[in-house]
């Protein structure tokens, strides 16, 4: 069974990059996205269930890995996409 704690543990290395922060609010866990250039929160996502949190973080993780592969300077290659897909699969397996 997937729990919030398991999701947090799986994504801890990604979260330690400092772009995303998870806070517990009176309405549930919330994912905040920080823009270092503008020095402000640019995205807020409430996660009602551990599955919601896992899905949202997996999407952010995938986008981040795609960005890291190119640094926004070129299109993703098939090799880039394959490597990101492998990293995504590893995260999915850890969530099981």
Question: What do these predicted regions represent?
Answer:
Residues 1-19, 61-78, 91-96:
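Negatively charged, low-complexity tracts enriched in Asp/Glu with abundant Ser/Thr
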Residues 23-81, 85:
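Acidic, low-complexity, intrinsically disordered interaction modules
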């Amino acid at each position: 069974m997937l729990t919030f704690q398991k999701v947090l543990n799986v994504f801890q290395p990604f979260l330690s990059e400092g772009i995303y922060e998870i806070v517990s609010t009176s309405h549930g866990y919330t994912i905040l996205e920080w823009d270092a250039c503008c020095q402000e929160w640019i995205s807020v996502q409430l996660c009602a269930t551990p599955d919601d949190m896992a899905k949202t973080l997996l999407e952010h993780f995938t986008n981040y890995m795609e960005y890291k592969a190119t640094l926004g300077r070129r299109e993703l290659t098939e090799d880039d996409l394959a490597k990101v897909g492998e990293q995504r699969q590893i995260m999915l397996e850890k969530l099981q």
